[in-house]
Amino acid sequence: MTDAGDTPPRPRETMRGQPRVLQPFLTWVTGVPLAGSAPRVRWRPGLAAAAGVAQTAIGIAVGALGLKAGGVLAVLLVLLAWPVIAGGMRRLDVVVVHQTLHRMFVASDAGNRVMSEILTTLLWRPPYDGNKEEHLLHHAYPCSLRDGDTNYLSGTGARPGMTRGEFRRYLVKAVFSPRHHWSFFSARVKANFFSRPPAYRLAMALVYLAATVAFLAFSGMWLPWLLLWFVPATFFFHNQTFLYTLSEHRWWLFDNAERLTKAQRDQLTFARFCGAPVPARSGGTTGGARRALAVAAWWARMVLVYAPYRLCVLVGDTVQHDLHHVRPKCDWANSSWERNDELTGDRAERFYEVWGGLLTHVYVGNSVLETSARPSVPLTPVAA
């Protein structure tokens, strides 16, 4: 079985010698703080929501600048903006809306409902009641055939036991499948208008639709809206949701059984840590130069491969999704440190992890041959 980051020291601890000013960036990208460290900023739910709004707005602004500039620059900036905008939308959906379903975004039931209904209306996502019912069913019967996410992935052609080559071909086919995108989009339309939502929620959806059409008709901004809202809210949102969901759990580990022991349920979810160990020092007269090049290449991967994955797909606290299933009432906005603390307590044996990137995580989530997760262990500080 293969297992990223299987040899000590832990991958995050190999980064201890990197510049101190860059450690918060490395904590964000990897999802793991250094052993013994404390957060420099204590996150709150409102700050998590603001981050989603800011990311979406910045992406739209970058795309708008591109459209204004025209030419090749327009193409480059719009291509850059698309996954960033969708990532901001995903942050609002899979982080903020998700926590409202668990009544963990604000203290009151009414407040959670209001926040959820506003965001799901704007993002064309399912209304609060149906969304909550389906999500709690996911928690009750994870990875079973009663779990809507399992059925969604099955519908895209996912299955266990594929080779890496077979799985990559499946990924490409699903990402560009018109059937996949139409199924996803039509389900969103149905949930908002035709699934008998509460009268107030149907009114919200209709007013939003009418306001959008009226604004576009009077402003003539159809092209910017199509490029900077509709495309990222559909094609990119669908695919970033799809890629996230593929690694959310080990979907086929126990053959979609409904009745599982606590230990089996724990094995279904793993922390999706991003990155690789810093290249080790080597001896010899040329060892320093070789390591400098290796570290530069390592930094390039962290910035150009793993950071976009965190920004656009594995957003917010979703890195530590195993913590959410072990302890849903945790301080989710600071889950990196919460999970580290759990590894020193009496629930430590309930946590699993995989180090790597998108492909590594989706391989493990779908039982691709020769891949697996490993149990987590408490972090131990090592010398830089």
Model features per residue range: what roles?
Residues 120, 244-248, 319:
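Generic alpha-helical structural context detector
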Residues 84-97, 129, 180-183, 229-259, ...:
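Transmembrane alpha-helical segments that form the membrane-embedded catalytic/substrate-channel core
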Residues 296-320:
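Functional transmembrane helices that form membrane-embedded active or gating regions
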Residues 1-87, 91-92, 96-97, 101, ...:
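Non-catalytic, topology-defining segments of multipass membrane proteins
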Residues 105-123, 150-159, 260-301:
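Juxtamembrane helix-capping/reentrant segments at transmembrane boundaries
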